């Protein structure tokens, strides 16, 4: 005789009813997150397809494309738990060519001098600082200096002047907080900051996403909250127009490796814990690609010169390797690249090459003047002076990222 359990709802105790309803609702609640996990799997497959389709003719350019990250902190300046070994290993595993450290300052030591510098494991490191000025502005200084520790006692204008006198670079950090827009001695600005973007995370939704997706797709969960930095890009376009001069755009990884929890011994050895923003993951999301003439080596001087000139572009390489992207201009006298000025003369031809077919936006003085999909090379005749830049989108990756930039170029200034 077989015994079968036939639950009788009327005879079931109240707590069992509540428990059964709760379990049923919980299971139903998971369905959207299971679907979201499937979509991340599809995104991974689409990214792999994009990378497999890449075509790059390195001989067609007089420049070498070096990729790296800017705005990185270690435990040296506080606000971070990361150490030098973590950073070096993360950079190496990501295949980076350079890392610009931006240590917070200290009253007892020159953190720009004490941080990573030179070449480690094949990666070039530049020692810099992030500072808060007495004007309540924040700047990235590269290279940094011992003087950076006093930045909070003087105004932004003095900090910028001191940096320029040393022949060093200054970039506006967190432009949504910056107030000294009347000044002009900065070299550029962060038009994208990863930490700022993470503030848009819905932590309730992300918690349940993590239950299903974190183990397999922790990096691609970024696609859920990544947004085009509309306000920063608009401010950048307006700034160039108002100042009538070059303003270089960079992306800040703002890597701290300080999100998560752990239990460990007094030596710092972790016994158990979860690390939500390891350097290796942060370095994979967004990079700055700097173009350096092929006959010149990658060194601190050539890297900083490339950044200062705007010979660089921002790429969200998490969605596909952008190496090989070029944006140049030709007139009857020669060729220039992004960051350069070129005379209109009898006309200019803008040339865009991309490693894969993509959607290409050509933007003049902040306004889109061309929007074409499915192109890997585009040429545009130009008959008007203006500031021209490019945004590239990978529409083939699907709805999660198709409307979010893959590449943001620096401008070509047609004079």
Please report, for each region that a protein language model flagged, where it lies by residue:
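C-terminal functional module detector
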Residues: 2-45, 50-62, 243-249, 253-415
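A metal-dependent hydrolase metal-coordination microenvironment
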Residues: 40-213, 226-236, 242, 247, ...
